[in-house]
C-alpha cells in the first residue's frame, strides 16, 4: 500500500480549521490553584532502588523519560526497578504543548547508546523493558535503526526480557516503520495523545491521520504483533471526540489503549481544562473495552509505560 499517502480515509474528521481559542481560555490566568485531589497524589521518589537506578543511568550516560517528562509515577516505578529509557539524546526536535522534554538542536545520533541501554536492563534484571525516544526529525532512518539495535542488544545481553518500544511518527516514513517492526518488539506503541481538533496546539508537527496510519501499517507488516496507543484527557476535548478516537484506534487493530490525566508540567505548557475523576476513567475504560481492545489501562496517573509488562501479558492472554 502507499502508506505515506493513505490519510484521506479518515482525514474528513480532522477539523484543523476550527478555532483553538477555547483551549487557551479554559483556565483563567489569575485563578488560584485548587488543592490536588487525593487520586492525583503519587509516591515520592525516594528509597535505595530509586537512587541506585538514578546512579546507574548517570554512569552509563542514559536518559529516562521518567525524569525528562516529569512522570508522576517515578517513585513507584523506580522503587520496583522499572524505568522507561529514552534514547536519541535528551533534546526533542518538536515543541508539543504538553511535553516537558527539553527542545532544541540535538547532538549526532549515538550508535553506542543501544548497548548501554541493554547493559542497564541487564544490570537491573528486568523482565520487561520499555524504550522510547525524543523526536529526531533530522534523521528518521537513523532513529529507527537505534530502536532496532536496542531490541537486538537487549535480547543479547538480557535473554528473556520482553521489549516495548514507544516510537515517534517518523514523519510517515514507511522504511523507518518497517525497520522497527522487523526487529519484532513484543509491543509497538505509538501515542495519538489527543483528539484531532486539538492537534495544532497539543502536538506541534504531528498529524492525527499519520498516527493512525502508522499503527495500521505496523499491524499489516506484523499481524501477530501487539500494538498500543495512549491518549491524555483534560485538554479541552469532548467525550464524543474521545470515543471517536477510541473507535479509530480499534479500527486499525490497536490492541492496548492507555488513558491518563494531562498534568501541566509548568506555566509554559498548556493549561488543564479539567480533572477527570476515577469514576470517569472507569467509564472511559468500559466504553473502550466494548469497542474491542484487548486491554485498557485507564486512570488519573496512567501513562504509556505504566504497568507495561502486565498490560502486555493481559493483551496476549486475551487472544
Regions found by a protein language model. Give the residues of each.
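Local cysteine-cluster metal-coordination motifs and their immediate loop/turn environment
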Residues: 65-77, 88-103
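Conserved functional loop/turn residues at catalytic and ligand-binding sites
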Residues: 91, 95, 100, 125, ...
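Core AdoMet radical
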Residues: 100-116, 123-175, 180-214, 228, ...
Amino acid at each position: 500500500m502507499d502508506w505515506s499517502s493513505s490519510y484521506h480515509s479518515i482525514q474528513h474528521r480532522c477539523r484543523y480549521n476550527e478555532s483553538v481559542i477555547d483551549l487557551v481560555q479554559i483556565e483563567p490566568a489569575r485563578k488560584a490553584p485548587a488543592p490536588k485531589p487525593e487520586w492525583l497524589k503519587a509516591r515520592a521518589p525516594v528509597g535505595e532502588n530509586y537512587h541506585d537506578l538514578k546512579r546507574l543511568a548517570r554512569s552509563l550516560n542514559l536518559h529516562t523519560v521518567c525524569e525528562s517528562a516529569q512522570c508522576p509515577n517515578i517513585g513507584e516505578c523506580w522503587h520496583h526497578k522499572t524505568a522507561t529509557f529514552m534514547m536519541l539524546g535528551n533534546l526533542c526536535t518538536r515543541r508539543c504543548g504538553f511535553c516537558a522534554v527539553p527542545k532544541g538542536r540535538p547532538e549526532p545520533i549515538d550508535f553506542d547508546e543501544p548497548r548501554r541501554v541493554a547493559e542497564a536492563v541487564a544490570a537491573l534484571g528486568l523482565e520487561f523493558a520499555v524504550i522510547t525516544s525524543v523526536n529526531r526529525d533530522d534523521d528518521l532512518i537513523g532513529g529507527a535503526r537505534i530502536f532496532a539495535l536496542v531490541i537486538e542488544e537487549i535480547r543479547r545481553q538480557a535473554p528473556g526480557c520482553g521489549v516495548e518500544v514507544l516510537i515517534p511518527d517518523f514523519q510517515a516514513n514507511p522504511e523507518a516503520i518497517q525497520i522497527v517492526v522487523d526487529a519484532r518488539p513484543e509491543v509497538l506503541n505509538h501515542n495519538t495523545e489527543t483528539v484531532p481538533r486539538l492537534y495544532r496546539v497539543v502536538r506541534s508537527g504531528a498529524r492525527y491521520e499519520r498516527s493512525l496510519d502508522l499503527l495500521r501499517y505496523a499491524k499489516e507488516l506484523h499481524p501477530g504483533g501487539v500494538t498500543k496507543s495512549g491518549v491524555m484527557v483534560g485538554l479541552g476535548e469532548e467525550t464524543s471526540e474521545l470515543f471517536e478516537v477510541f473507535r479509530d484506534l480499534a479500527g486499525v487493530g490497536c490492541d492496548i489503549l492507555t488513558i491518563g490525566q494531562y498534568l501541566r508540567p509548568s506555566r509554559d505548557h498548556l493549561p488543564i481544562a479539567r480533572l477527570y475523576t476515577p469514576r470517569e476513567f472507569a467509564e472511559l475504560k468500559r466504553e473502550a473495552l466494548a469497542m474491542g481492545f484487548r486491554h485498557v489501562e485507564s486512570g488519573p496517573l496512567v501513562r504509556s509505560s505504566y504497568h507495561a509488562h502486565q498490560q502486555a501479558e493481559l493483551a496476549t492472554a486475551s487472544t
